[in-house]
Amino acid sequence: MAARPVSSTTSTCRPCRPAQAAASKPSTSSSPGTGVLVGVPRERGSSVSKAAIRGARLEAAARCSLVRQRPMLLATVAVGSLVAAGAANATEIGDSLLGSSGLALADLSIGDWFGNLLYSAGQQANEAVQDQLSALSFTSLAVIFGAGLVTSLSPCTLSVLPLTLGYIGAFGSGKDRSEVVGNSVAFSLGLATTLAILGVAASFAGKAYGQVGQGLPVAASGLAVIMGLNLLEVIELQLPSFFSDYDPRAAAANLPSSVQAYLAGLTFALAASPCSTPVLATLLGYVATSRDPIVGGSLLLTYTTGYVAPLLIAASFAGALQSLLSFRRYSAWINPISGAFLLGGGVYTLLDRLFPATSMVM
């Protein structure tokens, strides 16, 4: 029985062909005693030749399979790297989104944070004043001056700010810078005088603004609410009949502008006095216990100077504000805006006195 010559019918990749060709090429080396080629049919030893050829084929197929699997292995590694990189990027993006959401939450609570900051600053100013009152010095006066600055930033102060700016714009119209600043100083002195008189009165009476109970602060807050409603034209206040023929503007028109500003400052101090607690209550309490009018007047004057310092800064630019904002053109809005702030400030201070906050978390 003649053996069929070995032929390759399997399609292989290019790297596999040399190995397979080598396996199918006739061998020039002969086995001992045979002297024939591997591919030549023979009766004896044919099984050995077929086994050798089969082994060569299997080896070539194994090599080809490794070569074929290598691109798949590289592709698998590449895909795995991309997946890992994508996961890392997703983690970074997630962290950035969490950070941005945290910033958004911080932006949403910035109003509360700023309000808590002002409240904490006021409390710390009050504590600093209490510490400095134990031993008066020039440092004590500087601390009290700074406490006045902090108090001027309280929300309650906004209730009189539109009226103050409107008045500054009114008496600053058509006047030079020096006259405007002089009138503003007179206005501030009117504020300081009222609070200094309160200090002197407390020293003589032996009672403090903060020691007379809830009556005076609540009454002042209620007055602010009533005046705010009046400016908003919700309620109408009627003066007694003997004031019907009296025009305060006509009477004040005959006075110098600085005197008018001073008198206006006296009036504005009464409206702003509820905004000065608790620092003012601490000062007046100390003045009442010391029973020294000179010390009382000096401390209150120092405090009020710091309290009106922002007003003096605003007065320095009163002429520019007058030309840029044209207060007279928008004078119809002054009363409603002032009424809204007075109403809001009055309600705020009233609730603060009736329901004082025991703790404030930053």
Curated annotation (Swiss-Prot):
Positions of the UniProt region annotated as Disordered: 1-41
Keywords per UniProt: Chloroplast, Cytochrome c-type biogenesis, Electron transport, Membrane, Plastid, Thylakoid, Transit peptide, Transmembrane, Transmembrane helix, Transport
Low complexity: bias regions: 21-40
An individual GO BP term: cytochrome complex assembly
Transit peptide: 1-63
Subcellular location(s) per record: Plastid, Chloroplast thylakoid membrane
Bilayer topology annotation: Multi-pass membrane protein
Annotated TM spans: 71-91, 97-117, 143-165, 185-205, 215-235, 268-288, 294-314, 331-351
Alphabetized Pfam families for the sequence: DsbD_TM (PF02683)
Biased amino acid composition, Polar residues: 1-13
Functional description taken from the UniProt entry: Probably involved in the transfer of reducing equivalents from stroma to thylakoid lumen and required for the biogenesis of the plastid cytochrome b6f complex.
Family: Belongs to the DsbD family.
Protein's name in the database: Cytochrome c-type biogenesis ccda-like chloroplastic protein 2
Originating organism: Oryza sativa subsp. japonica (Rice)
Gene that encodes it: CCDA2
